[in-house]
Amino acid sequence: MKTKLIVVAGPTAVGKTALGIELAERFNGEIISGDSQQVYRQLNIGTAKATPEEQAAAVHHLIDVRDVDESYSAYDFVTEAQAAITDIVSRGKLPIIVGGTGLYLQSLLEGYHLGGQVDQNQVLAYRSELEQLSDQQLFEKIDSLGIEIKEINRRRAIRALELYRFSDNLENTETCYEPFIIGLDDERSLIYDRINTRVDKMVELGLLEEAKWLYDNFSEAQSARGIGYKELFPYFSGEQTLDEALEKLKQNTRRFAKRQLTWFRNRMTVSFYQISSPEYPENVIQDLAIFLNEEEGEK
């Protein structure tokens, strides 16, 4: 029998953390972070990490598991998430994965072994084709496909496109999970308004100080490449004004949200819910109760 689990996915700033905690309280669950940036200790504001109060309301896994100068990959996530799921289920609780890193979630749920065998001649031919494209053409291709990459540079863009193109040929082991994937969504303009408001709130909470510490000490680390930090570095170096840097941060976050939605719509089987609907989140809870074969709110 496959292990049932819940996934709360969607773009940034739609309330995934709040819903995850509510579901954990209602369905006797524990949360596994599915966010590539929240693994880093000391990076709390820019990653929109669950606050100490929120973490006290529900047990969280895969938060604060790496130092800021360490790397983290989809393989690391799958390995550690599988261990967390086994632990949670062994204690009679429900695993609830909350996050917006589509590649991580897909790799876990669909059983892809990222090191699987692919016809290398096909890969090389496709790579040669990509090498003929300009940087702008590569980045436009990345954006149109909704692919998430940590850093916008040519090498990473080509590698990401190769993975996207040949993912169906990777070794696909039978997954042992039966997920119910909740996708949170809203009108695009409302999501963008929430993003802009959240960036302003992050600044009030100390984002500039957090980003400056990262800039001064670990500017070349993988953790520093995430949206929320790198946009502020030109301000610290004197290349941009604060207003220019913050506008760039908001713009990049909005674009990232668009890519996240594209990924979840095109690459995963998701049940979407409009967060501005009067029926939200009651409709989510009702659907989960049916999925879990239990009466609403009981465990």
UniProtKB/Swiss-Prot annotation:
GO MF annotation: an example: tRNA dimethylallyltransferase activity
Co-factor requirement: Mg(2+)
EC number: 2.5.1.75
UniProt subunit comment: Monomer.
Family that this chain belongs to: Belongs to the IPP transferase family.
HAMAP family xref list: IPP_trans
Protein name per the record: tRNA dimethylallyltransferase
Organism of derivation: Streptococcus thermophilus (strain ATCC BAA-491 / LMD-9)
Lineage: Bacteria, Bacillati, Bacillota, Bacilli, Lactobacillales
The gene coding this protein: miaA
